[in-house]
């Protein structure tokens, strides 16, 4: 979906008379926080220095498919999700494309969000689409569980822009 957005932006730049160099600069310098964003500093990274830590706010089937495509292109590595979602989303639709790429999902509730899907329900949805899943009290607790099992895992915190925003605020 980001390719379509980039295409629209390039079309707008061309309509404004911008040259190819301006279009290339615009696309290559674009940054959207919490869209497969690598976390490289902060308390979460310090708690798991050997973990490859990522953050993505996708929360619908198209977002799940985009993340799955990205994971499929990455070098092989044990991959864990820390996932919190809203009760208004198609949780199974989001998770289904991720199933082949995930070692385990650690389900969390989204702190302070009244429409959070309880971690237990997120866990059940993951299990229903073939993902091994457990619950955790928080993102930090899930990360601690993951590091204890596989200190060099790839970890993707995902499932909600609300969860992603909270992680960015708390992680610095």
Segments and roles (model prediction):
Residues 160:
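Active-site-proximal loop/hinge segments that shape catalytic or ion-binding/gating pockets
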Residues 1-104:
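Nucleotide phosphate-binding/pyrophosphate-handling subdomain across enzymes
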Residues 163-165:
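Short, active-site-adjacent cap segments at secondary-structure transitions
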Residues 14-15, 49-55, 95-154:
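C-terminal helical cap/extension that packs against the catalytic core
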């Amino acid at each position: 979906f980001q390719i379509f957005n980039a295409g629209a932006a390039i079309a707008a730049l061309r309509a404004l008379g911008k040259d190819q160099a301006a279009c290339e600069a615009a696309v290559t310098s674009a940054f959207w926080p919490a869209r497969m964003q690598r976390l490289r500093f902060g308390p979460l990274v310090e708690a798991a220095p050997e973990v490859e830590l990522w953050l993505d706010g996708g929360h619908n089937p198209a977002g799940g498919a985009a993340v799955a495509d990205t994971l499929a292109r990455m070098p092989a590595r044990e991959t864990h999700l820390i996932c919190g979602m809203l009760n208004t989303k198609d949780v199974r639709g989001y998770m289904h494309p991720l199933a082949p790429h995930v070692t385990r999902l650690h389900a969390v509730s989204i702190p302070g969000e009244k429409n959070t899907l309880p971690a237990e329900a997120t866990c059940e949805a993951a299990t229903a689409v073939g993902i091994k899943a457990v619950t955790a009290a928080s993102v930090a607790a899930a990360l601690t569980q993951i590091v204890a099992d596989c200190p060099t895992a790839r970890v993707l915190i995902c499932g909600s822009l609300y969860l992603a925003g909270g992680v960015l605020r708390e992680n610095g």
